[in-house]
Every structure is written in C-alpha cells, then in structure tokens.
Amino acid sequence: MKRCRVDKENSFKIVEHETSWEGTEEIHRLSEEKLKKKARKIIEKNLKELSEAQELLYASNKYSLLLIFQAMDAAGKDGTIKHVMSGINPQGCEVYSFKKPSAEELDHDYLWRYNKRMPEYGRIGIFNRSYYEEVLVVKVHPELLSNPNPDETFWNVRYEDIRNMEKHLTRSRTVIIKLFLNVSKEEQRRRFLERLNTPAKHWKFSVNDLAERKKWDDYQKAFEDAINATATPWAPWYVIPADNKWIMRMIVSTIITETIQSLNLEPPKVSDDMKKVIDEARRELEKE
C-alpha cells in the first residue's frame, strides 16, 4: 500500500498516480471475472480480520478511527463503503454524508458541523465527503463564500486550520485515514452513461453532474493543492486507483484493516475481583 500513500507536503502530483492500476503481472494477466473473484476473496479475508480488529477497538475504548472518503462524482464512494464495511458491527460505526449546510451550521465556523460528528473512543466514523469539501467544492465555486473573491492566503489559512485540527485529533488518539478515490475522466463518462442507459440507476444521476464534469480540471487542481497542503505522517492521504471498482475496494479494505491491526490492541484486562465473579457465575451455570 506504500505506493498509494502520500504523507509529505508538496510531494503529490495527480498525473503521476494511476487510475487503473492492475497490480502485479499475475493480476494483470487475469480476466475481468477472475480479477473480480480474486479481489472478492481478499476483501472477504479482510472483512473477517476487520471485524475482529473492530471488536478490539470497541472493547479497548482507547482509540477512535476516522475514515474520510473524497472523490470525483461516480468514483464509487458509496459502493466502497458498503462493500468494505459490510462485515463490521453497526453499533461501533457511523457513516455521515454532509449535504448543504443548514442555517444553524452557517452560523458557526466552517469546521463546526464536522467536529460535531467526530467518532468517540472505540468507534469508527466514516465521512462520505468531509471538511475537505471546504477547500474543494468551495474552491471551485468561490461564489459559495460570503466573500466570493478569496486570495491564495485565504486557502492557505484553511489548509493550516485543517492540519492543526488533524494534529489535535491524532494527539487525542483519533486515527485518521484519508482516501482519495482517483477515477479517470473517461471512466467517469462511462459510468455516467451506464446510469443514463439503465432505468434502475436513473435516480443516481443529477443534471448537476454534467455541470461539475465541465470543471474537471479545476477539481483536479483543487485535489492536488489540498492533498499537497494536508498530507502529513500523522494524517496521510491514500490515492486509490478507482477505475476498477474491485481493485479499489480491495486496496481500501487492506489499508483500513492493516491500520487498525497496527495499533496492537488487546482486550481489557479483568481485575482479580471480577475474575472471582466470573468463576462464581460459571459454577452457578454449570450446576443447572
């Protein structure tokens, strides 16, 4: 997963990251169906390990995990969250999709509504889009700001705000994984056409999708700027090739699983008094 990781400021060029990485030569030779089958097996293995790791995360109550998914439209955020996180206990996980801010949210600073949703210890929080929209969509559409003519200093201050917030979160034992699902313009076109040609998928399409697609280059520049400004060792970005959904899901599931496992969590230790209670309860049940 090292090839996907970006953890140094000003080290990221979006054109240098593939959107259709096929992995090893062995994987490259596989047919689409065999590739999908192989990826599914790895995802299933990861799901089992992730479920066990999440149980320890919940039981130990020492860390929280924040997963951030950012991408262009049709990159597969929803499907990835669904497939990668399907095996975990829903009691220990919450997904948030941030829509247009409410009147109350607009009466606070721009990070307020995101801070309200940060996961508590023992839990996983998933942001399907996040506070990074404030330096992505808002940068492409500065008319959304009260001051529609921000200069570069304005954006640099926002990047600094985000870095400082993420530093505070990691010091407070929130582990942050930031995932940019890197889809190509041609693959986005293909997926849009698939939605338009499939009546059951019409609900996924918005006329705004085409308007935003016309700003592709602006968004790519905004992503590159944001990742360069906020990639740090404590809150790294992972740039995931997203043209093949199963490869993408396999990589994402591996990153999440390995990150939790790296915390080396253990079940809470039971006191001597509690051990006596457990022994007594066992004896009582065995007598029945």
Annotate each PLM feature.
Residues 28-42, 91-154:
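Conserved nucleotide-sensing/catalytic segment adjacent to the nucleotide-binding pocket
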